């Protein structure tokens, strides 16, 4: 598992992993209510990328990343 501390690094790695094999990739979001923390995980069962945040601005970036990944699926 690779844990990222920077959103930009996570987003670039997620796009690379997804473009390599979009059929096997899974994108999971988990929110911990007590800690106020959002955990994002993208995996293809070989490589696992994780990013954790408690910032609202990162949620908006998540929306942009998920739309980019979905756009990649639709265009194939």
Curated annotation (Swiss-Prot):
Its main location: cytoplasm. One of its GO terms (molecular function) is 7S RNA binding. GO terms for biological process: negative regulation of translational elongation; SRP-dependent cotranslational protein targeting to membrane. It holds the Pfam family SRP9-21. Keywords: Cytoplasm, Ribonucleoprotein, RNA-binding, Signal recognition particle. The keyword Membrane does not apply. InterPro entries: Signal_recog_particle_SRP9/14, SRP9, SRP9-like, SRP9_dom. It is found in: Cytoplasm. GO terms for cellular component: signal recognition particle, endoplasmic reticulum targeting. Belongs to the SRP9 family. PANTHER family: SIGNAL RECOGNITION PARTICLE 9 KDA PROTEIN (PTHR12834:SF12). Heterodimer with SRP14; binds RNA as heterodimer. Component of a signal recognition particle complex that consists of a 7SL RNA molecule of 300 nucleotides and six protein subunits: srpa-72, srpa-68, SRP54, F37F2.2/SRP19, F25G6.8/SRP14 and ZK512.4/SRP9. Component of the signal recognition particle (SRP) complex, a ribonucleoprotein complex that mediates the cotranslational targeting of secretory and membrane proteins to the endoplasmic reticulum (ER). SRP9 together with SRP14 and the Alu portion of the SRP RNA, constitutes the elongation arrest domain of SRP. The complex of SRP9 and SRP14 is required for SRP RNA binding. This is Signal recognition particle 9 kDa protein.
